[in-house]
């Protein structure tokens, strides 16, 4: 409301200073982000910083040529306080009472310069991450909403970024100014990521939005059209191929084919591309799209937890995560409703008797265990009736399971339906088929109250908004943290009259059942380090209830006793990844798929870290190929372990080592014995021109600083740091050689010849892993 006037004052050269407090969390981070975004460095924005005294004044100072005024009173900077609320304010003029004015102004000056801290990007980000919406904010929001509704009555709706969207837009623009060409927004369901991408796309003419379901594309098209009403838009799905539009909404299935991409588009067809649910980006069809197009900016959107289900997607986006807000933070900030979670012991199924293959229980065995289980059906129905929801979702393991539950509930007097893909429905037989509903029809009936519960199979995990859902039931093992949080997120959106979401989790003795407390609290990194009792005292989001059956707590304790720790946990995780991939994993593959808690343990315990001696680790497990066993005790293993263990305060050594791995002239079975200045310079510049990697280079505070560096500057950096340190490391593997910048010692010639391409592949794998490890750590520390 005040922003237009502040911007006008700024244009006139008026200095603007604001001193605010973080007392009781009344100051909203998004408001501060908006000020910084719109007014930039021309506003001096500060926090009161005396923790021993409360800060509660409201005063507004205005200075003119001949007079200054201060308004003192009860109005803070909020719509209701400045318009419709009952507030008392007093205006004091320096002309009328100079002594009193000077006293107030001197007090402000003292507070501003002596008892405050500047709100830098770092300070603001830290405040936003820890901010919890105060209880009084609910009343304030009600007043604001009423005032806004009165103002907007009869007016056309305006679409403007709100709340955390403002924060995300600020961070996205900041990252682009730093040179980023890609980025992931990792945000819990409910913040409006699609609208966020629409706002962020405004500076770009042609936009591509990619998703895996047509329903998501329709919702996205509506959002973009609301934000960009003058732009043409169309779809690239099924029989719709409207490629020549400003805003194109395309399904992965229709777009992710090489022949289609080459026939219909060029690599620069779009300036801005959005990949919805970007955790799918590693799939083949997504990869084809990413490989083909070269936009000015690529934005990935996801609500999933990055630390538990693989990291490869982050590599595709240069480990750039400009903005993230976890589910816990979103609930704390009032973006999502709180949840009342009930962990219910389901001992009607013995999961230990079922086969667990490649990270999942066999679907057919799960289905069989559920279909003829009257005791379980009654247990689920009993708890459902206890909490009497109006709009519920039940997540099932298969189409047969979903149909069975819909039939059982319907016959028990609860209007129910089943939702799964049409392909599955064609195979369904018997009268249970009668309970199947088309996805769109099902949502309408659930929203209207015509049916009370929908039982679904992988249909509502992501990308579908049904805000009215007030109860979700987990009716199958949720082995994947991604799936667990996606299912939870289906019911956390705010809706009129909805105060919280009820969650019924029917848990049994299945693998990782004891992960639930960590996922609900956001403390997943502590999974392998904590005890069962600690897990039950974790800090959950504000106003949330988490209640586990006593029998379930006993189960968690038993699982804790059997939980693998230390070396056993690392070995078990290695075998899990090997089973998942169906081959011995490379270092990069193990890093990509390793459980984050196990990985953190490896980083803390160097002796247990397989990445520091991966050949010997595999040898100890009997997983090393016969020809590679001959490397043990030779320079081959010593050289690899040197690269695996070399310290990396910065990333300087990696582009130098990458120069040895480049497949051009002079290599011996894929590796060079020596590299020239031009070899290293080419590798170095390519590496640091990627994304925001330039930040590592000495004396570079901005992307422009890096771009202005000469080859001489780069070579000075290269020679002084990585080349010098490599020559001093290990058993003298790196040496001087006439005509080259750096070389391998002569004895390595035999190693390269005898080791062949397999040795070269191991070395390249190490270098790639060390790069990924470095940037993952940088992202994690920043987060």
Regions from the PLM with identified roles:
Residues 323-393:
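Conserved interdomain linker/interface between the two RecA-like ATPase lobes of SF2 helicase motors
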Residues 280-341:
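Post-DEXD/H (motif II) to motif III coupling segment of the RecA-like Helicase ATP-binding lobe
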Residues 207-210, 214-216, 368-410:
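Conserved strand-helix element at the start of the C-terminal RecA-like helicase core
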Residues 481-483, 490-524:
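Conserved segment of the helicase C-terminal RecA-like domain
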């Amino acid at each position: 409301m005040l922003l237009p006037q502040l911007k006008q004052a700024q244009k006139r050269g008026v200095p603007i200073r604001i001193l605010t407090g973080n007392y009781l969390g009344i100051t909203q981070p998004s408001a501060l982000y908006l000020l910084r975004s719109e007014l930039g460095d021309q506003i001096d924005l500060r926090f009161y910083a005396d923790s021993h005294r409360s800060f509660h004044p409201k005063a507004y100072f205005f200075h003119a040529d001949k007079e200054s005024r201060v308004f003192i009173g009860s109005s803070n900077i909020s719509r209701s306080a400045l318009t419709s609320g009952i507030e008392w304010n007093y205006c004091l003029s320096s002309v009328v009472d100079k002594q009193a004015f000077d006293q107030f102004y001197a007090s402000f000056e003292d507070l501003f310069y002596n008892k405050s801290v500047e709100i830098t990007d770092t300070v603001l980000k830290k405040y936003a991450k820890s901010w919890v919406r105060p209880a009084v904010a609910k009343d304030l929001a009600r007043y604001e909403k009423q005032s806004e509704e009165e103002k907007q009555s009869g007016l056309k709706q305006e679409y403007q970024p709100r709340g955390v969207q403002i924060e995300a837009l600020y961070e996205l623009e900041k990252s682009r100014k730093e040179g980023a060409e890609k980025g992931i927004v990792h945000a819990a369901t409910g913040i409006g990521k699609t609208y966020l991408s629409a706002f962020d796309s405004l500076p770009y003419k042609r936009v591509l939005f990619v998703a895996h379901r047509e329903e998501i594309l329709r919702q996205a098209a509506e959002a973009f059209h609301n934000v960009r009403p003058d732009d043409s838009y169309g779809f690239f799905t099924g029989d719709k191929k409207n490629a020549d539009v400003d805003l194109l909404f395309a399904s992965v299935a229709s777009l992710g084919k090489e022949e289609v991409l080459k026939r219909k588009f060029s690599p620069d067809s779009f300036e801005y591309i959005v990949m919805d649910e970007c955790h799918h980006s590693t799939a083949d069809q997504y990869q084809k799209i990413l490989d083909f197009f070269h936009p000015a900016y690529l934005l990935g959107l996801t609500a999933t937890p990055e630390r538990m289900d693989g990291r490869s997607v982050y590599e595709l986006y240069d480990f750039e995560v400009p903005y993230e807000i976890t589910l816990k933070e979103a609930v704390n900030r009032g973006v999502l409703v709180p949840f009342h979670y009930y962990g219910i012991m389901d001992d009607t199924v013995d999961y230990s008797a079922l086969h667990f293959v490649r990270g999942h229980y066999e679907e057919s065995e799960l289905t069989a265990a559920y279909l003829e289980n009257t005791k379980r059906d009654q247990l689920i129905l009993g708890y459902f009736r206890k909490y009497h929801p109006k709009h519920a979702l039940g997540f099932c393991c298969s189409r047969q399971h979903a149909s069975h539950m819909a039939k059982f509930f319907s016959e028990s007097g609860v209007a129910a339906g089943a939702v799964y893909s049409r392909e599955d429905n064609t195979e369904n037989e018997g009268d249970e088929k009668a309970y199947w509903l088309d996805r769109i029809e099902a949502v309408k009936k659930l929203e209207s109250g015509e049916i009370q519960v929908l039982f679904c199979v992988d249909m509502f995990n992501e990308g579908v908004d049904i805000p009215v859902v007030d109860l979700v039931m987990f009716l199958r093992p949720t082995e994947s943290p991604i799936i667990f949080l996606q299912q939870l997120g289906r019911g956390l959106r705010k809706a009129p009259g909805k105060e919280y979401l009820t969650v019924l989790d029917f848990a049994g003795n299945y693998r990782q059942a004891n992960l639930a407390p960590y996922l609900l609290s956001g403390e997943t990194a502590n999974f392998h380090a904590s005890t069962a009792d600690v897990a039950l005292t974790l800090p959950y989001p504000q106003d949330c209830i988490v209640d586990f059956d006593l029998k379930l707590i006993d189960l968690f304790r038993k699982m804790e006793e059997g939980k693998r720790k230390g070396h056993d946990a690392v070995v078990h995780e290695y075998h899990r990844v090997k089973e998942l991939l169906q081959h011995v994993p490379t270092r990069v593959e193990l890093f990509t798929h390793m459980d984050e808690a196990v990985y953190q343990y490896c980083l803390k315990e160097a002796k247990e870290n397989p990445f520091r001696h991966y050949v010997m680790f595999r040898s100890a497990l009997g997983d090393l190929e016969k020809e590679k066993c001959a490397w043990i005790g030779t320079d081959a293993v010593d050289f690899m372990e040197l690269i695996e263990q070399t310290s990396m305060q910065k990333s300087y050594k990696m582009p130098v080592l990458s120069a040895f791995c480049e497949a051009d002239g002079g290599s011996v079975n894929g590796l060079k014995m020596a590299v020239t200045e031009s070899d290293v310079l080419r590798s170095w510049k390519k590496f640091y021109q990627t994304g925001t990697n330039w930040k590592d280079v000495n004396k570079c505070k901005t992307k422009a600083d890096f771009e202005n560096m000469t080859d001489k500057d780069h070579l000075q950096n290269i020679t002084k740091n990585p080349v010098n340190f490599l020559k001093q490391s290990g058993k003298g593997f790196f040496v001087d050689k006439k005509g080259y910048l750096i070389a391998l010692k002569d004895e390595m010639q035999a190693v390269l010849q005898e080791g062949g391409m397999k040795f070269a592949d191991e070395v390249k794998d190490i270098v790639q892993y060390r790069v990924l490890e470095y940037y993952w750590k940088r992202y994690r520390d920043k987060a």
